[in-house]
Structure formats: structure tokens, C-alpha cells
Amino acid sequence: NLIQLSNMIKCAIPGSRPLLHYTDYGCYCGKGGSGTPVDELDRCCK
């Protein structure tokens, strides 16, 4: 889910703010989701 993804990114990139940057990323990172994922990151949010 998005919270887990956020925590992984924060661990890998300290000081980052992933929820601000990835909330509406691609087709699945954010609220809802449909269609074909645009890349591996979007696929992870699925």
C-alpha cells in the first residue's frame, strides 16, 4: 500500500517526502487505481 511504499522510500532516501511526490503518480499510486501500471513503481502501488 501507499504507506508501506512511503516508508520504504524514506528508509532509502532519508529526508525525502514521498507522500507529497508520489500521491498521484501513475495509475495506482494514490487513491483508487485502474488501468495499466506505467512502470515498476506504479506496479508496486497496485
UniProtKB/Swiss-Prot annotation:
EC number: 3.1.1.4
Gene3D superfamilies cross-referenced by the UniProt entry: Phospholipase A2 domain
CC cofactor: Ca(2+)
Cofactor note text: Binds 1 Ca(2+) ion.
GO MF: calcium ion binding; calcium-dependent phospholipase A2 activity; phospholipid binding; toxin activity
Keyword field contains Chloroplast: no
Reactions that this protein is recorded to catalyse: a 1,2-diacyl-sn-glycero-3-phosphocholine + H2O = a 1-acyl-sn-glycero-3-phosphocholine + a fatty acid + H(+)
Cellular localisation: Secreted
Enzyme class, UniProt record, top EC level: hydrolase
Role played: Snake venom phospholipase A2 (PLA2) that inhibits collagen-induced platelet aggregation. In terms of inhibition of platelet aggregation, superbin c is more potent as superbin d. PLA2 catalyzes the calcium-dependent hydrolysis of the 2-acyl groups in 3-sn-phosphoglycerides.
Protein name (Swiss-Prot/TrEMBL): Phospholipase A2 superbin c
